């Protein structure tokens, strides 16, 4: 087993703080109805498309009607991306999973 150096831990903490800063900025942008321009500024068209695909992956995994291979073919996403989504969903807090089910599956 390898140990993280203090530098690695410090870098990881800095990145975590930067992530939290972005989340706070996004919350403020939503409160001021500036979320779309902010996201267009911060994300490339490919990144925005990838996020949309990830939402579809989570939605279809929650629905449970397609295999991961069928989902790969339907969405044109890599099997590794779908597997990561599946693994993330399995480890998600119950409250988040319930909210996602209600939001993504019951709103259609």
Swiss-Prot record:
Which gene specifies this protein's sequence?
A: trpR
Q: What does the annotation say about its assembly with partners? A: Homodimer.
Which Pfam family is one of those matched by this entry? Trp_repressor
GO molecular function, a single term: sequence-specific DNA binding
Q: Which Gene3D superfamilies match?
A: TrpR-like
Organism of origin is Klebsiella aerogenes (Enterobacter aerogenes)
User: What taxonomic lineage is listed for the species of origin?
Assistant: Bacteria, Pseudomonadati, Pseudomonadota, Gammaproteobacteria, Enterobacterales
Which BP terms in the Gene Ontology apply to this protein?
Answer: negative regulation of DNA-templated transcription
| Protein name (record) | Trp operon repressor
Q: Which InterPro entries match?
A: Trp_repress, Trp_repress_bac, Trp_repressor/repl_initiator, TrpR-like_sf
Q: Which family does it belong to?
A: Belongs to the TrpR family.
């Amino acid at each position: 087993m390898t140990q993280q150096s203090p530098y690695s831990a410090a870098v990881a903490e800095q990145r975590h703080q930067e992530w939290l800063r972005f989340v706070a900025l996004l919350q403020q942008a939503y409160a001021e109805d500036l979320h779309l321009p902010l996201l267009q500024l911060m994300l490339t068209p490919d990144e925005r498309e990838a996020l949309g695909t990830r939402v579809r992956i989570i939605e279809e995994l929650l629905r449970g009607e397609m295999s991961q291979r069928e989902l790969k073919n339907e969405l044109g996403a890599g099997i590794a991306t779908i597997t990561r989504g599946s693994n993330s969903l399995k480890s998600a807090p119950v409250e988040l999973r319930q909210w996602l089910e209600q939001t993504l599956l019951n709103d259609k």
